């Protein structure tokens, strides 16, 4: 059984200094970290808060994602794909179920579809010129409606490896939208050809 919230906090705070700051880790000192260790400080570790704040869309009647089920760049009967604007990496796409599900609520059939769709999207993103890898993330702490992130890592940018990619994305200047739109169209055309679906909602 996982540590209770108070046990976890006590375990973590035992490694912190008098200001509740944990030491810098092997990741923050690594060569792919966006931050130089000199002068870098860890934020104080705050005590746990229970109950946790409700996520957006916990009530399906007030779910933003459900209200946008007809918006996107690709659709089939059960899934939709959107492009996230204003990012720093070449392309960020998001896959959503059109109906209200979180990951643990998916039927086995929908879970199988998610696996196949994820594989097709990774193939098509990685086939884009000048893209080395498609990173895939499911977090879910902010929204109760399942959303899967696909980040395209630019070729040759070895500092953007691993889980730091999302931090680099936040630091980088906004990527040209016209290029991202064109690449998103290439991915969607390939997805329609390999998996099905269409550019327009039903």
State each model region's role.
Residues 146-153:
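A short beta-strand motif that forms the metal-chelation/ATP-contact edge
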Residues 129-142:
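A short glycine-rich, hydrophobically flanked beta-strand micro-motif that places a catalytic Asp/Glu
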Residues 84-86, 139, 151:
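Short beta-strand micro-motifs enriched in acidic
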Residues 75-81, 113-117, 141:
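Glycine- and small hydrophobic-enriched segments that form the cores of compact globular domains
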Residues 112-128:
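Active-site helix/loop of acyl-thioester processing domains in fatty-acid/polyketide metabolism
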Residues 93-117, 171-176:
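Short histidine-centered catalytic/ligand-binding loop motif
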Residues 1-95, 201-202:
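Active-site microenvironments that recognize anionic phosphate/pyrophosphate groups
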Residues 19-21, 26, 31-39, 154-202:
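C-terminal helix-cap and adjacent tail motif
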């Amino acid at each position: 059984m996982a540590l209770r919230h108070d046990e976890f906090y006590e375990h973590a705070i035992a490694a912190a200094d008098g200001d509740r700051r944990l030491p810098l880790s092997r990741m923050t000192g690594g060569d792919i970290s966006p931050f130089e260790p000199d002068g870098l400080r860890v934020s104080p570790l705050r005590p746990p808060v229970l109950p946790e704040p409700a996520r957006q869309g916990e009530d399906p009647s007030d779910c933003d994602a459900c209200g946008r089920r007809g918006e996107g760049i690709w659709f089939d009967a059960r899934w939709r794909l959107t492009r996230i604007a204003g990012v720093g990496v070449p392309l960020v796409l998001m896959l959503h179920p059109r109906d209200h599900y979180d990951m643990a609520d998916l039927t086995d059939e929908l879970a199988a579809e998610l696996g196949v769709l994820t594989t097709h999207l990774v193939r098509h993103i990685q086939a884009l010129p000048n893209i080395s890898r498609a990173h895939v993330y499911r977090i879910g702490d902010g929204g109760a409606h399942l959303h899967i992130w696909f980040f395209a890592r630019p070729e040759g940018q070895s500092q953007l490896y691993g889980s730091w990619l999302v931090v680099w994305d936040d630091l980088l200047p906004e990527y040209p939208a016209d290029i991202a739109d064109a690449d998103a169209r290439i991915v969607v055309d390939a997805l329609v050809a390999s998996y099905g679906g269409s550019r327009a909602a039903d």
